[in-house]
């Protein structure tokens, strides 16, 4: 690129191309990194969700060591990094907890409060699962998905405990399992 005034277009490609994408857990196999990678960013708008995912992807995400002060209720109740509002205030005002704007919330706060599947160990193909809101009888994963999909299709969330932590399969995953 020339230093000539108005000449801002570059005519050659990038000199050094990356052959592999960056992996944030390549050398850091700590428990904290696994928890950060498994974290679900809920209660935020699409843009803030993308920003938080970028921070996680490139090892720029730093978890909070102690709760921060909420800008609405002025209590030390903010437990998520980079958020400015606590969960109750963000839910009440229906705004993004990170930027404070009245945008569409990608993953609402209320999802983790709905009925869940409890796992009695590490999940395999047909591991015993218990559903707290039903008869509490063990069943295979396919039978539970079929049965609960018919009764609680709109509100059920599968919570799978994996080595790294909790992973949520929302409505789209539920439709795939029950179809």
UniProtKB/Swiss-Prot annotation:
List, alphabetically, the InterPro entries matched: DUF2039 (IPR019351)
Q: Which domain of life is it from?
A: Eukaryota
Name under which the protein is recorded:
Uncharacterized protein C9orf85
N-acetylserine sites (modified residues): 2
Q: What is the primary gene name for this protein?
A: C9orf85
**Pfam families reported for this sequence:** DUF2039 (PF10217)
Modified positions (Phosphoserine) are: 137
Tell me where the signal peptide lies. none
PANTHER family annotated for this entry? CHROMOSOME 9 OPEN READING FRAME 85, ZGC:101016
Keyword annotations of the record = Acetylation, Phosphoprotein
Q: What disulfide bonds does the UniProt entry report for this chain?
A: none
